[in-house]
């Protein structure tokens, strides 16, 4: 409990530095893990007032030679490894590593996410749909009891900071400000991928939980560079993928898709003497380097469609829908039937 209150107090310092109010926040804040650093390794931050060197050790954070329990830097900007970020930063030791966490308003965070997730060349309505999903994804991950809410990599949403921002992405964020997808009064699971291959996947096919608004559905709009593909797989790549899932290869037979999911993705796969089923079969194909699990095999040649896990919005599908005159609300309605576009304060109750 002491550690929790220490963290809350530290967050309050950052809020004050950013000119923000503590809960009930006028601008909702998110905490993004930028980097985990080994204890003893020095990190240098560029601040408006100059450079600061810090490193973690078991007792806390050493900043310019001073040992502190944790450390917060005020905004409005800072740079880590020559990449600038909006907002403030908190440094603390957790789990034997130094955590560097960017604390900033949700809408400012999205300005650094959208450019990483959808090109500025995509139509405005597609960018707006992506902005709503990125916001919804972030809000669903908020957890005040954890040391941070989100990471900055593909494991969460890619976050590139200030230098990635563009006027087109900013317009999409501002035009949808405070709007999230909701279902039955709760913030929805806002999943997205590159290309559905013509059929979206049910959420349980990949994430084991069936959600009523994430069902397999035809997607005639998904037309991207990976809508149809073929790729050779090397036996050693397949063996590595099996081992990564905890299986030991027991033969030399090439991959075979023995059963498909309702959306047409691999559901039971046999290769190298091993049979893998369910969501793990789809993960196996991705570990083998294939663009998607919507694939069949001719020996060691994979023939497939689409890119990504296939659940939720297809980004290339959103592009085509926008080009055909659909608005972002209609795009979201196609990929998330039954959901509502809600003000954040309503969906988060």
Locations of the language-model features?
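Conserved, single-site charged/polar hotspot
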Residues: 1-349
């Amino acid at each position: 409990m002491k550690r929790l209150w220490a963290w809350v107090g530290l967050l309050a310092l950052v809020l004050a530095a950013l000119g923000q109010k503590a809960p009930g926040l006028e601008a909702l804040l998110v905490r993004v893990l930028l980097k985990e650093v080994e204890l003893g390794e020095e990190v240098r931050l560029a601040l408006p007032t100059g450079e600061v060197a810090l490193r973690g050790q078991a007792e806390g954070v050493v900043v310019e030679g001073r040992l502190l329990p944790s450390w917060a830097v005020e905004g409005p900007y800072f740079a880590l490894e020559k990449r600038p970020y909006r907002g403030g930063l908190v440094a603390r030791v957790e789990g034997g590593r130094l955590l560097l966490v960017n604390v900033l308003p949700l809408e400012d965070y999205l300005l650094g996410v959208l450019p990483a997730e959808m090109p500025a060349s995509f139509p405005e309505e597609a960018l707006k749909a992506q902005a709503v999903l990125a916001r919804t994804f972030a809000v669903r991950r908020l957890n005040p009891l954890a040391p941070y809410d989100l990471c900055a990599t593909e494991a969460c949403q890619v976050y590139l900071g200030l230098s990635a921002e563009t006027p087109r992405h900013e317009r999409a964020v501002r035009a949808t400000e405070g709007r999230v997808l909701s279902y039955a009064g709760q913030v929805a699971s806002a999943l997205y991928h590159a290309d559905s291959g013509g059929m979206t996947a049910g959420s349980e096919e990949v994430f084991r939980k069936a959600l009523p608004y994430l069902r397999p559905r035809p997607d005639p709009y998904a037309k991207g560079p990976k809508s149809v593909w073929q790729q050779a797989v090397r036996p050693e790549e397949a063996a590595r993928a099996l081992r990564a899932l905890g299986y030991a290869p027991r033969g030399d037979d090439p991959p075979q898709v023995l059963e498909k999911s309702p959306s047409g993705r691999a559901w039971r796969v046999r290769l190298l003497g091993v049979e893998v089923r369910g969501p793990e079969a789809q993960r196996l194909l991705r570990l083998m380097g294939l663009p998607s699990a919507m694939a069949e095999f001719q020996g060691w040649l994979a023939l497939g469609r689409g890119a990504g896990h296939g659940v939720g919005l297809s980004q290339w599908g959103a592009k085509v829908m926008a080009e055909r005159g659909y608005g972002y609300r209609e795009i979201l309605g196609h990929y998330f039937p039954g959901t509502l576009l809600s003000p954040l304060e309503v969906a988060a109750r």
